[in-house]
Amino acid sequence: MRGVLIAAMVALVVSLLGTPWVIRFFRRQGYGQEIREDGPSSHLTKRGTPTMGGTVIIVATLVGYFLAHLVTGIGFTASGLLVLLVMTGLGIVGFLDDYIKIRKQRSLGLTARMKFTGQAAVALAFGLLAVRFKNHAGLLPGSTYISIVRDTSLTVGIIGFPLLAWIIIAATSNAVNLTDGLDGLAAGTSAMVFGAYVVISFWQFGNLCEPGDSPAGCYAVRDPLDVALVAAAAMGACFGFLWWNASPAKIFMGDTGSLALGGAFASIAIVSRTELLLVVLGGLFVIETLSVMIQVAFFKATKKRVFNMAPIHHHFELAEWPETTVIIRFWIVSGLAVAFGLGLFYAEFLSHGNG
């Protein structure tokens, strides 16, 4: 528990104190956000706001994680390092996307094919590595079985697992990217989901199956304490960044942050065996993504729009909701989704006769 607290506090402090320095540096370099002309007119005033703030979130998470290990003397684990690999790898893809936007002064960076290739490379590397590195109990970071709150009997096989990992990682990172359209929305929502994974992973650690000792409801997962440590560091980093990203934002996380956060969620869900539970915990990300899918499909079929604009947070902006109202209400939705997801997780544990 001490390591989890250290990781969260160190990441919070690094992010909180490091972000102003990054804001000043990016302003001097002219690293400002380009704004879509077809978006809400109120967003045009945000043009030039420093972006690529996700670099702070990633660095703060890494510092929190590694310093917590240094202080506690706990060894590094395959699961924790793989989550950080995905987070950092997708952060690099997002950084390249943001950098191209800034250099070419346009709202679009990498081509869809280039971004797809980058996401696929990171996800497939994770998928191949996650089915290696058995521990003393014979457990791997990843599992070929599809999981809800723990592994089910449905398996995709050793060949299908990298593909499954790619789908989950790509879908989640793109979902967070779509949500990152209002000041503080993605950062605040991400902090909640990471907080949920601190609880889930630490609970798994306290109820871990051990060789020769597998009480009812125990969890056959590898390295849950280290996963909790990563989630705590990421949560602290998000909260520290949110201080400066809250409306009116002094800096945006950019694709650097949104892709990295999505990758972290997906990889944590995979190593904690909660792949489908992530759909509930990240309910707001799902709603935002579905709004885009519905809008595109309906427009192609009828040439009409369901929403004023997608993702759905822009629909409410164009319906003349103040931006802060949209953000706070969406945070409430996210909080309810996280609470419901944690309730499902605990209810499943109780169903094994642990009540």
From Swiss-Prot:
Pathway: Cell wall biogenesis; peptidoglycan biosynthesis. It is found in: Cell membrane. The gene is mraY. It comes from Frankia alni (strain DSM 45986 / CECT 9034 / ACN14a). NCBIfam families: mraY. Its cofactor is Mg(2+). It catalyses: UDP-N-acetyl-alpha-D-muramoyl-L-alanyl-gamma-D-glutamyl-meso-2,6-diaminopimeloyl-D-alanyl-D-alanine + di-trans,octa-cis-undecaprenyl phosphate = di-trans,octa-cis-undecaprenyl diphospho-N-acetyl-alpha-D-muramoyl-L-alanyl-D-glutamyl-meso-2,6-diaminopimeloyl-D-alanyl-D-alanine + UMP. CDD domains: GT_MraY (cd06852). It comes from the Bacteria. One of its GO terms (molecular function) is metal ion binding. Belongs to the glycosyltransferase 4 family. MraY subfamily. The chain crosses the membrane at residues 3-23, 56-76, 80-100, 120-140, 152-172, 185-205, 224-244, 251-271, 276-296, 330-350. It is a multi-pass membrane protein. GO terms for biological process: cell division; cell wall organization; peptidoglycan biosynthetic process; regulation of cell shape. Its main location: membrane. This is Phospho-N-acetylmuramoyl-pentapeptide-transferase. It is an enzyme of class 2 (transferase). Keywords: Cell cycle, Cell division, Cell membrane, Cell shape, Cell wall biogenesis/degradation, Magnesium, Membrane, Metal-binding, Peptidoglycan synthesis, Transferase, Transmembrane, Transmembrane helix. Its EC number is 2.7.8.13.
